[in-house]
Structures are given as C-alpha cells and as structure tokens.
C-alpha cells in the first residue's frame, strides 16, 4: 500500500534524476531535488512504520502553534521582532515596498498556511475526541485559523475549509450517529451549492470571488489566483515536453520561462517574479517526474485518505486531508 507507493516513487524519482538532461544538483535549486525528496519519503515511511499519534504530541504542537502565531500577531500589529522585513517597513509593505509576504516563525505565508493546515485540524480534532484536559487545544487551533485568514493565505483557507466541511460529518459519524452525519453532509452540500449560485449570480467587481464567478461563467484568465492559472498552464507545458520521465526532481525552476511584472503606483516600484514553482504539488510531480511519478504520488495520497475514511488515526487523517487540499494550490516546499 503506502510503503509500496512511496518506495516506487523514490525509485522513479532516482531514475528521472539519472536520465535528466538538465544537470540539476541533488539538493535542487529550491531544496526540492532528489535528496530532499528522499529524506521526506524515508521520514514518511519511518513514521508510518513506527509512529503513532499521541496526546502529548498534540500538546507540543499546540505550544508550537501558539508561539508561531503569537509572533505573527505581533507582526500583524506592525512590529518586526524577527527582522523579516526591510528596515523601516512592516508586514503591510508586502507587495508595495518589497516583494514577498512573510509572517510568523516560518516566514513565507504560503508555508505558514501549509503548516497551519496540518496543525489546526489536528489540534481541533484531538480536543473534540479527547475533551477534558485537551479542550484547551481549541485555543491554538482557533488562533492558527485566525492568522491564516489575516495573512490572506488563500491556499491555507481552502485547506481549512475542506477540513471543516469533511471533518464535521466525519466526527458525527465517529460518535455513532451515521444518520445525523448524512444530514450534516447534505446540509453542507446544499450550502456550498447555494454559495456557488450566489457567486455566479452576483459577484463583486474584484477579488477572489470575482475570479470564481468568472470561472463559473467559463471565462478563465491566466492572472486568476495570483497567476496560478498561468503557472499551472506552464506546468502542463513542461509535462508535455517530457511526459514519461519529466525533467527530473527540482527542475521546474530551471525549465520554466514564465515571468510576471507588476507596477505598484503607491511605491513607484516594478516587481518581476519568475514562476519557479508549480503552485500545485501534483502538477509539480507531473512536470518533474512525468506521468508515472505523479500517479504514484497521488496513489500514496489515496492510500492515506482511504485509511482515514475507515476510521484510522482520525486527528492525523483530517490534518493530512487539509494539507492535501492546500497542496493543490500551495508551493510544496518543506517547512520542517
């Protein structure tokens, strides 16, 4: 199952690396080469074989999230405790006076959102299942969700929304109330459909909901999703160049020719960004490892989510589901 998928994925990545014509290093230009991938896979196999979820891990995670989010709150209030921003600027200068957006102890807001997509559902589910002395874990979970929203991490918000929508009926079913779980699921489906219809009929003039409305109307622009649509198109173009073996682990940044320029009237600066990441882990595998590599990656996820649906490790499972949904829009760089 899981071990077979990851073992085959590692072997395929090694073959792709050996036969790559791009001469990429073992580390990769963004620490996304074969060596980091091997470390991630071996870590996952070790955890799957010998690890298990314990309440004490949740407590340590809750403390870690609290510290990270406390720093983020200070930064959102205008302070610069970790010197993440240029001298004289704060978090709100992102995209105006300097390029990039940084928050918390992790820095990059996309990585922060990915971390909180893992942490918040795991903490909330542990609190709900254990109750008693674990109820306090709801506080760092709520704080993490608030920081995700305030940091405008769209991928993180999508991941947390998925955890809420999937986790609520799942939890009700775990408590032995399948009929109630089906009612909750039907109610959620009705709310989602109603929300989509509302966005379709009356969307705002700009922003994420405007872009969603345009997509629902069949009008798709490459600039949507902070240019993610264009980047995904670039990933598919790179896949078409080498559909079997891909370019090799960590070669997306070397092969991509996509660039964006943006003039900022408030500062008079022009920022140029190179698309050096697929902003979707599945598409990154497709471009770097070819179709077999992407299928093995998705097969490993399918095994994990199937185990969760069968009731194994519910707290860890909902966290992984949240991360997986986030990874469809995230940058996929390890934050450990």
Task: Cite the ranges covered by each PLM segment.
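Hydrophobic alpha-helical transmembrane segments in integral membrane proteins
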Residues: 200-212
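Interfacial juxtamembrane loops and adjacent helix segments
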Residues: 81-103, 210-226, 238, 249-287
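Cytosolic linker/terminal segments flanking nucleotidyl-cyclase catalytic modules
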Residues: 319, 329-336
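Hydrophobic alpha-helical membrane segments of integral membrane proteins
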Residues: 27, 155-161, 334-336
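Acidic/polar, glycine-anchored loop/turn motif associated with catalytic or activation segments
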Residues: 235
